[in-house]
Amino acid sequence: MVAKKDKYVFAQVIRDVIEFLEIEDDPTPELTPEALAERYTEILQIAVRLVQQFPDVSLDNELPNRPRSWKVLLHHVFQIPKAFLDNEEKSQEYTYELMTESPPEKLKNSSDISNFGEEISNRFILWWKKSRDSDFSKQVPTYFGMTSRHELLERTVWHSTQHIRQLQSLLENLEIKP
């Protein structure tokens, strides 16, 4: 949240913050959808590889200062693109609940989660092949308001990427080279 006196704006969308603070800036994503898709394909493959490295005994560990297990975080890395793809392919609203959905019972260990990640990665690649020439300026509904498909793709990429850094750090804390 960003506040000025008795007014505030939720800082979910950079465009809202820029307008609220009356800053002259263009919040349009700098990378094209094609560049974002290329990077995301790599990022998802890195995530799959990192998840495979987690010992199953560590999955119930809690993140520092956060009531979230490592298992939930590992799943979340792939639930983010799943929510994006559901929005794109099924016209399902991009909700906070969908993005933060808990891992299903069938995902019991690191191998199960990495297999789920591989499925999502392959689904993303197929989606991109079909969508690359579509209109990314089209507005879509999300839990933080209407946003362009381009902005939602960018947000999806950076969100997963931020969690990749967490995975690397957790592996390093276990003295496992990422």
At which residue positions do the language-model features occur?
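Short, contiguous alpha-helical
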Residues: M1-E30, A37, S58-P103, Q139-P178
